Amino acid sequence: MGLIMVFSSSIALGDGPKYVNAGRYYFFSRQLIFILIGLFAMAFTFLMPMKFWDSKAFWGYCICFLLLALVLVPGIGREVNYAYRWIPIGPFNFQPSEFAKLTMIVFTSAYTVRKQKSIHGLKGFLPIIIYLGIICFLLINEPDLGATMVVVAIVMSILLLGGLGFALFSLLFLSAVLLVIAAILTAPWRMQRFFAYLDPFSQEHAQNTGYQLTHSLIAVGRGGFFGEGLGLSIEKLHYLPEAHTDFIMAVVGEELGFVGIFFVILLFVLLVRKGLNVGRQAIAMDRLFNGLVAQGVVVWFGVQAIVNLGVCFGVFPTKGLTLPFISYGGSSIVISLMAFGLLLRVDYENRCLMRGQKPLGIGASYA
């Protein structure tokens, strides 16, 4: 469904000045390539035993730190709209913030398992907050508040599921809220977005910072219950910016209506529910790392989907977050499929343990 909607929402972009050299199949073909790469990456993460990922968690964090630091280096990171979020690799652009989400799931899960005896106190709590703070500092400086919020939500959920005490969790939650407020208050463009979110159709905002939101709401409103029909969106014809990425759900709403929106939401609900059950099952079989990774993955998908949908429907201020598996984006789809491979691996190892079988995979020393 995601590939179809990317094709539908991007088919007219080649007619505009921004993508003058792009044909109607440009984004479709690139997304297809990204999906194929992602499927190979998913197969790799599925074939590697979970013990392998547990043992390499710290090295993954180090690679994540290096990539996030490199993206801020002039001449290495690519600047788009005053933000440095991409590293050019040939004809493609890699977004380290997507890798950071997956890395922090694995790293926080491994840390929580190793610090089970001290995670309830400051001795075990402070180090992971320092690790998190370093990643958040780099993300904020891109700047990418949306990715920062998702990473914080991932870490908070894993720590809570891993046994973090209510007092420390409340402290972390309050700190996260204050961080978001400070990030908004200290950045004039974020303040403008916030005020535009409060009244997007006002004369002051409708043609400026509220432009995306107003056209997103118009698209969803035009769709009604059953939609205008696949491919028949008007807003994607150079009215709604980023219709194939951050605001693809507005096109879904316009073309497929409430029925299409409900179907997408249902798929995410089923995915999150299944992932949480897989995680609980792993924890019940004394595979805490496996369980935390599985639950962390679906928390990531769920939180990011909620924010993306909320932005498209005017529930949240505009943020640059893709809809997992649906929006156009190479880094997003590849890393999301890698994470899905981990979820499948946890489920596979659960089934093998219940049957008394040895899980198969690459690397006998990790089995």
From Swiss-Prot:
The keyword Cell cycle applies. Its main location: membrane. Its EC number is 2.4.99.28. One of its GO terms (cellular component) is cell division site. It comes from the Bacteria. Pathway: Cell wall biogenesis; peptidoglycan biosynthesis. Pfam families: FTSW_RODA_SPOVE. Keywords: Cell cycle, Cell division, Cell inner membrane, Cell membrane, Cell shape, Cell wall biogenesis/degradation, Glycosyltransferase, Membrane, Peptidoglycan synthesis, Transferase, Transmembrane, Transmembrane helix. GO terms for molecular function: lipid-linked peptidoglycan transporter activity; peptidoglycan glycosyltransferase activity. It catalyses: [GlcNAc-(1->4)-Mur2Ac(oyl-L-Ala-gamma-D-Glu-L-Lys-D-Ala-D-Ala)](n)-di-trans,octa-cis-undecaprenyl diphosphate + beta-D-GlcNAc-(1->4)-Mur2Ac(oyl-L-Ala-gamma-D-Glu-L-Lys-D-Ala-D-Ala)-di-trans,octa-cis-undecaprenyl diphosphate = [GlcNAc-(1->4)-Mur2Ac(oyl-L-Ala-gamma-D-Glu-L-Lys-D-Ala-D-Ala)](n+1)-di-trans,octa-cis-undecaprenyl diphosphate + di-trans,octa-cis-undecaprenyl diphosphate + H(+). The chain crosses the membrane at residues 32-52, 57-77, 87-107, 119-139, 149-169, 171-191, 251-271, 296-316, 323-343. The keyword Protein biosynthesis does not apply. It is a multi-pass membrane protein. GO terms for biological process: cell wall organization; FtsZ-dependent cytokinesis; peptidoglycan biosynthetic process; regulation of cell shape. It is found in: Cell inner membrane. Belongs to the SEDS family. FtsW subfamily. Peptidoglycan polymerase that is essential for cell division. This is Probable peptidoglycan glycosyltransferase FtsW. It comes from Taylorella equigenitalis (strain MCE9).
